[in-house]
Amino acid sequence: MDNLCKLGWLANEFLLKDSFDAEKYKPEDIGIVLSNANASLDNDIKYLETTKEIASPALFVYTLPNIVIGEISIRHTFKGENAFFIFEKFDAGFIEQYVSNLMDNDILQCCICGWVELLKDEYKAALFLIEKDKSTDSVNFTKENLTKIYQLQNG
């Protein structure tokens, strides 16, 4: 597993720990929407170095950023809609609009979404668990709240 996948996988484990009941949903009702600024560039650089000798298939597998979604999905048996977007910076408005559309059109009942960025020794992760049926202690799913939480986690 490359470092981007490790970061996303670990952030997801913290997100779901003690706060998520997957049994409430069918696997196809749980999706993942992630984004970052550098795609899989950290691993792409490592892969490029291996091509000077013999290209490493083990590294090539991780030259797509959406592999992190696959690793999370396999771990938790999530089978719903998923997408990975590349933006210059965290775009809470896009995340809110995209995930809301998936929920409003009954494509998903639950979505893990957010930002998973890693390049060399710098990394940022902010994941959000969005459920169509809100609990009493839920925070409203708005771009303002996403931005506020992202900034608290990442400065």
Question: Where are the language model's segments positioned?
Answer:
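Conserved beta-strand-centric core segments of catalytic alpha/beta enzyme folds
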Residues: M1-N3, L7-F14, E53, P57, ...
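Conserved thiamine diphosphate
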Residues: K79-G80
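Conserved beta-ketoacyl condensing-enzyme motif
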Residues: M1-E71, R75
